[in-house]
């Protein structure tokens, strides 16, 4: 979707190459472009792991080259209240949340959008690899997959609503990452070769367990296999997620003989977290039955068009960058939905998002309950 000529568009400038090219493209189209750098985490809270200062310098350098104004806005209080607090609650409940999904819905397309509108913006834009269009038949706005399958970010945007999409532009939706990099170099953007950010800003480059330990603390308990054999001790169920292979501390233990999809030298995987007994269940072998499921239930559903889709066959993702999985949805509502998959799905994880697609259109999704 493109903006009308000469609209006032506020762009979220992160300091990365994607948002930089986004701002450049909109400027080239003749729009009045203003950049906003969002500070979502206080430096005092992160021990220097979140390089917001460096990122702002990069964003300001980009704004200077493109010839636009940039404003530094602090959303840290909103982030802690709306995103981080929920992040901790989910981990304490034994689930594995995806804070990027909540951050998009609550900060980047709510707090940021509200701020941009106060500045007189008609649209906001970000460097996400996704698309938005208005369906001529229904008049509703639709969220589309990005053209680059390796970078498509519609999964993280599935909780956006009609108000948010109606005000949003995704200029990179039709481009591939290689094209964005090439364009950044061709026009001389100072961050053209900057490495893509990975992970969550408030965790940074530190080990995840080290970070989480500051807020939740250890709660040791037994590690048991699928037959109840005690293999070791875990440091707290919050520090593990389904399908996890590394960091279990039981790598030297091997089953005697092949069993359930794994031989004597097959690796161990986290299969269940039993909160009632504080027990971490592990199994040997990637294709152990405990790691496979044909159905899931999701709660706290959000539907982009405002109403649940009709029962039928769709595609779904239960994690980012997963290939679309064919499924059937028998019924759905605002409270939740249930999916049945054509093929077994691996390590479907409570707390992560189940996102539904009809071809190239993202319909919405919910939080996996089990």
Swiss-Prot record:
It comes from the Bacteria. InterPro entries: MnmA-like, MnmA-like_C, MnmA-like_central, MnmA-like_central_sf, Rossmann-like_a/b/a_fold. Keywords: ATP-binding, Cytoplasm, Disulfide bond, Nucleotide-binding, RNA-binding, Transferase, tRNA processing, tRNA-binding. GO terms for biological process: tRNA wobble position uridine thiolation. Gene3D superfamilies: Adenine nucleotide alpha hydrolases-like domains (2.30.30.280), HUPs (3.40.50.620), Translation factors (2.40.30.10). Its EC number is 2.8.1.13. This is tRNA-specific 2-thiouridylase MnmA. It comes from Verminephrobacter eiseniae (strain EF01-2). The lineage of its organism: Bacteria, Pseudomonadati, Pseudomonadota, Betaproteobacteria, Burkholderiales.
């Amino acid at each position: 979707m493109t903006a009308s000529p000469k609209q006032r568009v506020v762009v979220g400038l992160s300091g990365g190459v994607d948002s930089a090219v986004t701002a450049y493209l909109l400027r080239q189209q003749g729009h009045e472009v203003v950049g906003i750098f969002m500070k979502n985490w206080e430096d005092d809270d992160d021990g220097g792991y979140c390089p917001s200062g460096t990122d702002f310098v990069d964003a300001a350098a980009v704004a200077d080259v493109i010839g636009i104004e940039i404003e530094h806005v602090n959303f840290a209080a909103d982030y802690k209240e709306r995103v981080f607090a929920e992040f901790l609650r989910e981990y304490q409940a034994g689930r594995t949340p995806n804070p990027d999904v909540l951050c998009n819905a609550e900060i980047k397309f709510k707090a940021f959008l509200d701020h941009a509108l106060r500045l007189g913006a008609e649209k906001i834009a970000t460097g996400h690899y996704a698309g938005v269009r208005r369906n001529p038949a229904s008049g509703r706005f639709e969220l589309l997959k990005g053209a680059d399958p390796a970078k498509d970010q519609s999964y993280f945007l599935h909780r956006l609503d009609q108000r948010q999409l109606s005000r949003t532009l995704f200029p990179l939706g039709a481009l591939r990452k290689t094209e964005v990099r090439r364009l950044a170099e061709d026009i001389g953007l100072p961050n053209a070769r900057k490495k893509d950010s990975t992970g969550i800003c408030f965790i940074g480059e530190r080990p995840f367990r080290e970070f989480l330990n500051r807020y939740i603390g250890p709660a040791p308990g037994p590690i048991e296999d699928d037959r109840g054999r005690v293999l070791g001790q875990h440091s707290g169920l919050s520090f593990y997620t389904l399908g996890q292979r590394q960091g279990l501390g039981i790598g030297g233990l091997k089953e005697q003989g092949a069993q359930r999809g794994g031989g004597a030298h097959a690796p161990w995987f986290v299969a269940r977290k039993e909160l009632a007994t504080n027990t971490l269940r592990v199994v040997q072998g990637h294709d152990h039955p405990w790691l496979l499921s044909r159905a899931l239930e999701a709660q706290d559903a959000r539907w982009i068009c405002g109403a649940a889709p009709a029962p039928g066959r769709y595609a779904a993702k239960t994690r980012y960058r997963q290939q679309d999985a064919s499924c059937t949805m028998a019924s759905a509502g605002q409270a939740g939905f249930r999916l049945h998959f054509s093929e077994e799905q691996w390590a479907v994880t409570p707390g992560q998002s189940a996102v539904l697609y009809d071809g190239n259109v993202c319909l919405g999704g919910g939080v996996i309950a089990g």
